[in-house]
Amino acid sequence: MKHLWFFLLLVAAPRWVLSQVQLQESGPGLVKPSETLSLTCTVSGGSISSYYWSWIRQPPGKGLEWIGYIYYSGSTNYNPSLKSRVTISVDTSKNQFSLKLSSVTAADTAVYYCAR
């Protein structure tokens, strides 16, 4: 079965914007078609509380696409075009938030970013 590659990057916002806050993604580098992509973003240098946390992606040769965001309290908002396949969750005890994208296809191949 053909594999899809998903590239993970460290996303560190400029210090003058987020002070010492850094975001580190983790997850598998590849997912098979029809499977679920699961990524986790760990927030360090600050608390996950009181902010909105987002997932975005950039397909090869294309612009950025917003996937969705979650507030530290757990409320979410998703891109309507992905809503049926996306779940974003937060774990304040671990200072982490996560993305699950189900039923992946070749169209989901992209660089995935977490951001505040």
From Swiss-Prot:
Residues 1-19 form the signal peptide. InterPro entries: Ig-like_dom (IPR007110), Ig-like_dom_sf (IPR036179), Ig-like_fold (IPR013783), Ig_V-set (IPR013106), IgHV (IPR050199). Residues 20-116 form the Ig-like domain. It comes from the Eukaryota. Residues 115-116 are annotated as: Complementarity-determining-3. GO terms for molecular function: antigen binding. One of its GO terms (cellular component) is extracellular region. Keywords: Adaptive immunity, Cell membrane, Disulfide bond, Immunity, Immunoglobulin, Immunoglobulin domain, Membrane, Pyrrolidone carboxylic acid, Secreted, Signal. One of its GO terms (biological process) is immunoglobulin mediated immune response. Residues 70-76 are annotated as: Complementarity-determining-2. It is found in: Secreted; Cell membrane. Its main location: secreted. Disulfide bonds join 41-114. Residues 45-52 are annotated as: Complementarity-determining-1. PANTHER family: IMMUNOGLOBULIN HEAVY CHAIN. Immunoglobulins are composed of two identical heavy chains and two identical light chains; disulfide-linked. This is Immunoglobulin heavy variable 4-59. It comes from Homo sapiens (Human). The gene is IGHV4-59.
